[in-house]
Amino acid sequence: MQRGYSLVQLLVVMLLVSILATAAFTAYRESVRSANLRAAHAALLENARFMEQFYTKKGSFKLTSTKWPELPVKEAGGFCIRMSGQAKGILEGKFTLKAVALDREAEPRVLRLNESLTAVVCGKMKGKGSCTDSEEIFRGNDAECRPFTG
């Protein structure tokens, strides 16, 4: 009479458990990335509301002809948020906010929101740099963009 499980049976069970754990972890990680992107979108909307109020008071989205106003929300969901591009050269009545992941290796996507509250998510961002190098990565240069649906 045999008692217990054979080595082959235990290995099969371990294999099945590891496959299920891998699938669950992948789904969890994607869920977290999606939640972080939604948090960044909410912060972009809050900053856009600030920009609209600023425009109502000052008659321009710019602080000066070459400078943007300071945004109230600078980081959310693992993304840093800045104005895209320099104020100089941007048409009056226009702005674009941009959210770039603090860890660009883990999250290469970029989220942009313009003055019309149109949000796009871009799959790739050209250029190197980090959130502290605002000149380089907040200029534009995004690729594979599509509307953001949340």
Please provide the spans of the model-predicted regions:
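N-terminal alpha-helical signal peptides/signal-anchor transmembrane segments
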Residues: 31, 40-58
